[in-house]
Design a protein with these regions (language model features):
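Short, flexible, solvent-exposed loop/turn segments with mixed acidic/basic and small polar residues
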Residues: 1-8, 36-41
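Amphipathic, hydrophobic secondary-structure cores in small proteins
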Residues: 13-17, 23-82
Length: 83
């Protein structure tokens, strides 16, 4: 079934692991991205990111942008829903 030409909506959450000394800066950077929210951080350098975007391409672009932030160690997707 093709979704071409149809509106899509993607909700995704994941854990971002980063260097603890960069945690606050990275959280602020992620929070400033379109469709992104940040939640639940800890002092060891982990926080939850929530993305609500209109295409799978935008989702991949945003996750890639987060992974390329200096000090990010990795991202682990926890949930993804698309309509």
């Amino acid at each position: 079934m093709s979704t071409e030409g149809k509106e899509q909506f993607h909700i995704s959450s994941f854990v971002v692991r980063c260097l603890p000394e960069r945690l606050q800066d990275i959280m602020a950077t992620v929070a400033s991205m379109p469709g992104a929210e940040v939640h639940g951080d800890d002092a060891r350098g982990k926080f939850v990111a929530l993305l609500e975007l209109e295409s799978d391409a935008a989702l991949v672009e945003t996750i890639t942008a987060i992974e390329l932030i200096q000090g990010v160690v990795n991202t682990s997707m926890v949930y993804h829903h698309a309509e």
